A protein has these predicted regions:
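Short glycine-/acidic-enriched loop or helix-start segments at secondary-structure transitions
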Residues: 20-21, 54, 76-77, 109-111, ...
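Pocket-forming structural segment of enzyme catalytic cores
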Residues: 112-199
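Hydrophobic/aromatic beta-strand patches that form the interior of the parallel beta-sheet core
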Residues: 9-11, 43-45, 66, 99, ...
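Cysteine-nucleophile active-site neighborhood
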Residues: 68-139
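N-terminal beta1-alpha1 cap of cysteine-dependent amidohydrolase-like domains
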Residues: 1-94, 220-247
């Protein structure tokens, strides 16, 4: 019996500082695709967030969609935010599952009626303890995970004030809402970064260290230099591809 090939679109929203030397490690789609379970056949495709996604990519052409993180502010009325928000709703209406990560989670929350704003405490970075809510324990996105686990974070905006129909799945201390799921079970968001590892997060942050040191209330270098891997991220991506992506 032939194995079904699942088509997954990665919407790459990462913005790199100008003037960086080429580096193959800055492959955002690869950060996600490397965790594909061996038992699944997945064809990965990447599209930049600034492309005209509503005209170029019909949701019907995909079995699943992942929205990457980004330094963009999901709470602004930037045209990129507006068009991607519209596309998220089109995916839901077409029955296509979507996983939003960090910025993707925030934008998803916004278009579903939640509040998104800068966190008054500023930046959350590095290893972060979180725990599942009752709704999170019931979600297949978190199959195989304990009630409490560590994740890797990199954000200063947060989702809050969830409307009816938007469920809180993962909780944290600094950012209370670390995961959401809509009433259809198609749209899932996580504030943290399941795709990343310490090396990748340092790759992102090394060009930004000097700028951010005076902005934060903790030892930025100590946090970045002593991050530990978080295997929970791989499990969450496995679960999304296995349980939700159409096959």
């Amino acid at each position: 019996m032939a194995t079904t090939i699942r088509r997954v679109l990665l919407v790459d929203s990462v913005v790199w500082p100008p003037g960086l030397d080429p580096d193959p490690r800055r492959d955002v789609c690869g950060w996600f695709s490397r965790w594909t379970p061996h038992a699944l056949r997945v064809d990965w495709f990447r599209v930049g967030v600034e492309s005209n996604i509503n005209e170029l990519h019909s949701p019907d052409g995909w079995d699943g969609v992942i929205l990457s993180g980004s330094p963009r502010d999901a709470w602004t009325d930037d045209p990129v935010n507006l068009q991607l928000g519209e596309w998220i709703l089109r995916c839901r209406d077409a029955g296509v599952p979507v996983l939003g990560v960090c910025y993707g989670h925030q934008l998803m929350g916004r278009v579903l009626g939640a509040r998104v704003a800068p966190h008054p405490g500023g930046l959350e970075l590095g290893n972060t303890p979180v725990h599942l809510t009752p709704a999170g324990r019931a979600s297949k996105l978190f199959d195989g995970l304990p009630d409490q686990f560590d994740v890797l974070s990199s954000h200063s905006d947060v989702v809050s004030d969830l409307p009816p129909g938007l469920v809180h799945t993962v909780a944290g201390t600094f950012a209370a809402i670390q995961g959401i799921q809509d009433s259809t079970g198609l749209l899932h968001g996580v504030q943290f970064h399941p795709e990343t590892d310490p090396e990748t997060l340092r790759l992102i942050w090394n060009p930004r260290r000097e700028l951010w040191r005076p902005r934060v209330r903790f030892d930025l270098d100590d946090v970045l230099d002593h991050m530990k891997p978080t295997p929970s991220g791989r499990q969450i991506l496995h679960n999304f591809l296995h349980h939700f992506v159409r096959g």
